[in-house]
From Swiss-Prot:
Organism: Shigella dysenteriae serotype 1 (strain Sd197)
The protein's annotated pathway: Glycolipid biosynthesis; 4-amino-4-deoxy-alpha-L-arabinose undecaprenyl phosphate biosynthesis; 4-amino-4-deoxy-alpha-L-arabinose undecaprenyl phosphate from UDP-4-deoxy-4-formamido-beta-L-arabinose and undecaprenyl phosphate: step 1/2; Bacterial outer membrane biogenesis; lipopolysaccharide biosynthesis
Highest taxon, organism lineage: Bacteria
GO biological process, one term: lipid A biosynthetic process
Protein name (record): Undecaprenyl-phosphate 4-deoxy-4-formamido-L-arabinose transferase
Protein's job: Catalyzes the transfer of 4-deoxy-4-formamido-L-arabinose from UDP to undecaprenyl phosphate. The modified arabinose is attached to lipid A and is required for resistance to polymyxin and cationic antimicrobial peptides.
Length: 322
């Protein structure tokens, strides 16, 4: 049996992108929640290339008296998961909690995650209760969760909720992974010996709009399919075999009908031939698209460009800035 080590220091990692309206409330509530833990803590806020006043507000928060806030400024927008990985590379706690900046997942849930992690879990996930999102967001989330469960075999209920807790060794393992497309909840579960989910409250978004547009959700689904498994390639081979067998069967059937009913019937079968042709063409384009996604991933990984570039790190005034 592995020895269970109590949590001594908590690091809260929060990616920020154009969230200037919610930042004061976010900082206040997160600080209050962390103070109630009775443990050492730090709050890492990563500005993911915001175009509003978010970065300036983060710097001011880090420089405030008795601040526990570490501000990490990226030079441009790299996406939510890359920003979180940037935060992971600067944490000093032995339990790391991720949280969205939109306050839909209340920071007041942090003590519950810490208490559950203290029971010896490597990963503590959450399931949003009474989700306050639009019908489209809920439907897309259900589809993504089912896709992940089928491809990974991990029966986690809500991969889209970023309010999660990770033990330090899980974060260190993720930092050793070099793929450019990273979906953190899934990657963490690959390394976790013990994982659990707990229900959490979900509030309406009070400030701004969701940063996940329709196209970004589509891109996310492509990322999940191509970075998790090669199953689509196997399915593509199976689909190709089925189409080939079907095409051969139809060809044999057409010959038999031609011999049975004569050339008059053959003229009327032109549209069926076109249908078969378009079926093959459509299947080829689907296959080429999937192969292109995988080849694109390989190309991106081979170039080995960094996931992000940290422009500046501002630590509390008692510590030296980087």
């Amino acid at each position: 049996m592995f020895e269970i080590h109590p949590v001594k220091k908590v690091s809260v990692v929060i990616p920020v992108y154009n969230e200037q309206e919610s930042l004061p409330e976010l900082i206040r509530r997160t600080t209050t929640a962390c103070e109630s833990l009775g443990k050492e803590y730090e709050i890492l806020l990563i500005d993911d290339g915001s175009s509003d006043n978010s970065a300036h507000m983060l710097v001011e928060a880090s420089q405030a008296e008795n601040s526990h806030i570490v501000s990490i400024l990226l030079n441009r927008n790299y996406g939510q998961h890359s920003a979180i990985m940037a935060g992971f590379s600067h944490v000093t706690g032995d339990l790391i909690i991720t949280l969205d900046a939109d306050l839909q997942n209340p920071p007041e849930e942090i003590p519950r995650l810490v208490a559950k992690a203290d029971e010896g879990y490597d990963v503590v996930g959450t399931v949003r209760q009474n989700r306050q999102d639009s019908w489209f967001r809920k439907t897309a989330s259900k589809m993504i969760n089912r896709l992940i469960q089928r491809t990974t075999g991990k029966a986690m209920g809500d991969y889209g909720c970023m309010l999660r807790a990770y033990r330090r060794h899980i974060v260190d393992a993720m930092l050793h992974c070099h793929e450019r497309s990273t979906f953190i909840p899934i990657l963490a579960n690959i390394f976790a010996r013990r994982a659990i989910e707990i229900p959490v409250h979900h509030a309406e978004r009070e400030y701004g709009e969701s940063k996940y547009s329709f196209m970004r959700l589509i891109n996310l689904m492509y990322d999940l399919v191509t970075c998790l498994t090669t199953t689509p390639l196997r399915m593509l081979s199976l689909l190709g075999s089925i189409i080939a067998i079907g095409g051969f069967s139809i060809a044999v059937l057409l010959v038999i009908l031609r011999l049975t009913f004569g050339p008059q019937w053959a003229a009327e079968g032109v549209f069926m031939l076109f249908a078969v042709l378009f079926t093959f063409i459509g299947a080829q384009f689907i296959g080429m698209g999937l192969l292109g996604e995988y080849i694109g991933r390989i190309y991106t990984d081979v170039r080995a460009r960094p996931r992000y570039f940290v422009q500046q790190v501002i630590r509390p005034s008692s510590k030296e800035n980087e």
